[in-house]
Amino acid sequence: VFGAKVEAGRVDRRVSNPIIATPWLTADASEAVLEIPGAARFHVWQGRHVQVQVMPGASASVIRMWLEGMVASLVLIQQRRFALHASTIRVGGRLVAVAGPSGAGKSTTAALLAGRGHSIVTDEVTAVDFAVREGVVIPTVCPSGRRLRLRRETVERLGMSRDGGEEIIGTGKLGFPLVPTDHDELSLELVVVLRPEGGEVVSDVHALTGPAALTALITNTLRPYFCILQHQAHLRWIAGLASAVPIVQLDRPSNRWTGSRVAMLIEEAAMGGRDTDGLRPRHAAESNSTPRADLPVAPLTPSSAG
């Protein structure tokens, strides 16, 4: 998990002076104990080691779900690293992070873009680091190895085969393995924030700058409530990311399917069809769009492995 070694073993540790203290999680900046009733107890230490005590009857797919999500977030925080709650796709050779709250359509959008010939790099968790290249600070993303997780009804709507999708018990979702990328780190070039809205909303994009961009990045940080553990480092990360990458917001209606148009708008923004420094909302009427169910999701590997 992001370089941390994962081992099975009994978890008896307690965090003596926690900054976060809830019935299920105690944590400070370097240590955390997470307890998921009926699933497992996890001890995360210094961002380098994870010990897992699996409860009787817990399925491997559920344990992996927690390792890829909550535990991965704690590992990153202890490493003084941060992630966007985003799926990341290579669109026309450019790396785009599609962020948004749970249920905004991040994974669905990633699958739609994959069906249009693009490659999924990460799903839901996009850890962003900074590298210096020729004197310029560049935000970079490392593939997480996380599965693409889609609801069954989404799989059916997209016309995808369930072959190779592992059921994640208790979630109503299937996990599909992603094709490994041949790069260890990729330059992030655009962040798209999905914003579902009720009513007659036109799907369109507009640039976010200044406080609006900072607020969007803070809101779409993976589990932002964990960032109290590394508050100053998180603020520096937000400022660095906002100054290095265009941030755009994509408004879409929450009451009808607009997946194909959303995918097209992201392609336009990523591939230069629109000026991401000057995007403005449009107010023209939008017709209902329908998914292209005949498109295969090329970057997904049919496999029974989770």
Regions found by a protein language model. Name each.
Residues 87, 92-101, 115-279, 300-301:
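Glycine-rich, often acidic-flanked micro-motifs
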